[in-house]
Amino acid sequence: MRSKVTGAQRWVVKIGSALLTADGKGLDRNAMGVWVEQMVALHEAGVELVLVSSGAVAAGMSRLGWTARPSAMHELQAAAAIGQMGLVQAWESSFAEHGRHTAQILLTHDDLSDRKRYLNARSTLRTLVELGVVPVINENDTVVTDEIRFGDNDTLAALVANLVEADLLVILTDRDGMFDADPRNNPDAQLIYEARADDPALDAVAGGTGGALGRGGMQTKLRAARLAARSGAHTVIVGGRIERVLARLKGGERLGTLLSPEREMLAARKQWLAGHLQTRGTLVLDDGAVSALASDHKSLLPVGVKLVQGSFRRGEMVVCVAPDGREIARGLSNYSAIEAQKIIGHSSEAIVRELGYMAEPELIHRDNLILV
């Protein structure tokens, strides 16, 4: 099963606050430098990488001279705003030493639940990854409400894994993985090396909360693994203090807890699309487009669409039908109904001429398309 780790080409790596700070006294630049060395080595091995970094609140607390994590929301948000500056600067300078560019992206869960913003974020992240840039993602703590209290960077990392269709989510923590009992209280506790993410037995052993600087306990990590599994990603929960942990995972070493999905990525994602979105409009296709979708599993291009029906926005679900009215597929449209009306029947190269811009060359990308 560890071949799923060694063969993974797109990783989302989440690093917790405890692994990025010097015992609560600000960011540990040396530790961050070691993480960067490991991630650069993955890059050089051909791995596409997205980093989800905690640490903004902890860094801000240090700059403000606070020794205890505040409970008041406005104080947490102030600390996050101050700390985010130093956090991003530290990552940028460390990666620059190795000739790598980084990009800061701040997200909230609303950004990923709104379909239009979801597609925008997806396109941006894909472009950055293809350019060899390492996106550094954090939750936008200054504008969220309850999320900041519950260590939701674990959940955010899982949602990002879904967003970029990652093969692997690596959650680095201050524990070696999931155990069958609390190792802090039970010296006989055994590490769970491999399990199915949806195994109900895991709930009984995932109790406990996070440390003083972060709030992400093992329960949030299990929930994150289950979220990632919906799009087919495998998750490794592993100790961040293990020497060369990322390289050793890449090499197939049996470290941490590997939680696997029930389905492969494509099937799980298609099922998620099919079961959670209402249709907002209809695209009537020509015979060539029907064949391209049904037989060749290609994206839907504007040139293959004859008619647009209904009112929909970018990112909403539409039905694709054959000339005789048979439903062929459903998918997330890259363009609104008004935009689609202007570009149907035209080649992708003509989109800019018709609209003045081009969001995507496809009307519906095959990754966002479900055959019925």
Curated annotation (Swiss-Prot):
Superkingdom of this protein's organism: Bacteria
Keywords: Amino-acid biosynthesis, ATP-binding, Cytoplasm, Kinase, Nucleotide-binding, Proline biosynthesis, Transferase
Domain PUA: 280-358
GO biological process, one term: L-proline biosynthetic process
Binding site for ATP: 14, 173-174
Record-linked InterPro entries: AceGlu_kinase-like_sf, Asp/Glu/Uridylate_kinase, G5K_ProB, Glu/AcGlu_kinase, Glu_5kinase, Glu_5kinase/COase_Synthase, Glutamate_5-kinase_CS, PUA
Gene Ontology CC annotations of this record: cytosol
Binding site residues for substrate: 54, 141, 153
PROSITE patterns listed in its UniProt record: GLUTAMATE_5_KINASE (PS00902), PUA (PS50890)
Primary subcellular site in the record, as a coarse category: cytoplasm
UniProt EC number: 2.7.2.11
Short name of one Pfam family: AA_kinase
Annotated family: Belongs to the glutamate 5-kinase family.
Described purpose of this protein according to its UniProt entry: Catalyzes the transfer of a phosphate group to glutamate to form L-glutamate 5-phosphate.
Name of protein: Glutamate 5-kinase
Gene: proB
